[in-house]
UniProtKB/Swiss-Prot annotation:
The active site is at Y123. One of its GO terms (molecular function) is ribonucleoside-diphosphate reductase activity, thioredoxin disulfide as acceptor. NCBIfam families: PRK09101.1 (NF006576). Induction: Induced 4.2-fold by hydroxyurea (at protein level). The lineage of its organism: Bacteria, Pseudomonadati, Pseudomonadota, Gammaproteobacteria, Enterobacterales. This is Ribonucleoside-diphosphate reductase 1 subunit beta. GO terms for biological process: 2'-deoxyribonucleotide biosynthetic process; deoxyribonucleotide biosynthetic process; nucleobase-containing small molecule interconversion; ribonucleoside diphosphate metabolic process. Pfam families: Ribonuc_red_sm. Inhibited by hydroxyurea, leads to dNTP depletion, replication fork arrest and genomic instability. E.coli produces two separate class I enzymes. This one is the functional enzyme during growth. A substrate-binding catalytic site, located on R1, is formed only in the presence of the second subunit R2. InterPro entries: Ferritin-like_SF, RNR-like, RNR_small, RNR_small_AS, RNR_small_fam.
Length: 376
């Protein structure tokens, strides 16, 4: 099936599946098959922010005063987060848009990917402020062995889906020879790769950021690197939306409500999805071990972080219909919720950047009674 950027075949978008239907032609938002994606778009747009809005000048002083092992923790997490959001800033668009067939999901994916680019820009904003030569930090990302171990597990599912999608659009179903390699293309196999890719992305959004988040917030609990923590808090708020998006996609697919064949595929892939999550959790535990190899920090150590990884992994896996692999049932660092739930904290607006501020959410109506107490 050849992909077209504007199909001239008239269709009823309310009857199209999320994926593998007719490519989206008119981007219309007066009707939605799944209004959850429209709500996510509106919420993400209301969250719009820029890293330059947050003052990180004090962080440079704090960073210079940190002991070496805490500098290692801080800068390593920024490297890892830069990798994750570099992937997420482009991959959802490249991998998913050619397969999507409803406008609200198409626009949600574009909105999601755009917000990830803001996250990438944020890390540059932070790193540029605390080190004299940011290139030293960025150049290490593609050579750091610990980061590379994680990169392969994240990118491989995207790459496989993108490759088979290209064959499907260009060659169609069947067995083909491409550059001397025999390639078998089938719609069912492509659907399976899509499902596994979405599950991998879900694991990324659900687990892979949270060791880094916890460290950033632990510094701020000690009134250190507070500008960084404010930015990370905004990023965490966005990531919670992205996680909700992938969870809804997966649950619609595995229920069979969108595509009955996807329910069968979800059942077939259940063990592979389980293993995928467990592997992601183990990689995050290994990352915690790497971070704390030279010493822990006040309020946080490797063991506590590993328990937290197990705790959130259970919650995230349950949300997409998978069995729970770990015994940990309670949150070992409950203070982190203060940072992850923006409504939990009241601040004086003149003192700090207000992370709960929403764009386009103001009631602009003014009544004459509102001015009755004014005197000239």
């Amino acid at each position: 099936m050849a992909y077209t950027t504007f199909s001239q075949t008239k269709n009823d978008q309310l009857k199209e599946p999320m994926f593998f239907g007719q490519p989206v032609n008119v981007a219309r938002y007066d009707q939605q098959k799944y209004d959850i994606f429209e709500k996510l778009i509106e919420k993400q747009l209301s969250f719009f922010w820029r890293p330059e809005e947050v003052d990180v000048s004090r962080d440079r002083i704090d960073y210079q005063a940190l002991p070496e092992h805490e500098k290692h923790i801080f800068i390593s997490n920024l490297k890892y987060q830069t990798l994750l959001d570099s992937i997420q800033g482009r991959s959802p668009n490249v991998a998913l848009l050619p397969l999507i067939s409803i406008p609200e999901l198409e626009t949600w994916v574009e909105t999601w990917a755009f917000s990830e680019t803001i996250h990438s820009r944020s890390y540059t904003h932070i790193i540029r402020n605390i080190v004299n030569d940011p290139s030293v930090v960025f150049d290490d990302i593609v050579t750091n062995e610990q980061i590379q171990k994680r990169a392969e597990g994240i990118s491989s599912y995207y790459d496989e889906l993108i490759e088979m999608t290209s064959y499907w659009h260009l060659l169609g179903e069947g067995t083909h020879t491409v550059n001397g390699k025999t390639v078998t293309v089938s719609l069912r196999e492509l659907k399976k790769k899509l499902y596994l890719c979405l599950m991998s992305v879900n694991a990324l959004e659900a687990i892979r950021f949270y060791v880094s988040f916890a460290c950033s917030f632990a510094f701020a609990e000690r009134e250190l690197m507070e500008g960084n923590a404010k930015i990370i808090r905004l990023i965490a708020r966005d990531e919670a939306l992205h996680l909700t998006g992938t969870q809804h996609m997966l649950n619609l697919l595995r229920s069979g409500a969108d595509d009955p064949e996807m329910a069968e595929i979800a059942e077939e892939c259940k063990q592979e999805c389980y293993d995928l999550f467990v592997q992601a959790a183990q990689q995050e535990k290994d990352w915690a071990d790497y971070l704390f190899r030279d010493g822990s920090m006040i309020g946080l150590n490797k063991d506590i972080l590993c328990q937290y990884v197990e705790y959130i992994t259970n919650i995230r896996m349950q949300a997409v219909g998978l069995d729970l692999p770990f015994q940990t049932r309670s949150n070992p660092i409950p203070w982190i919720n203060t940072w992850l739930v923006s409504d939990n904290v009241q601040v004086a607006p003149q003192e700090v950047e207000v992370s709960s501020y929403l764009v386009g959410q103001i009631d602009s109506e003014v009544d004459t009674d509102d001015l009755s107490n004014f005197q000239l």
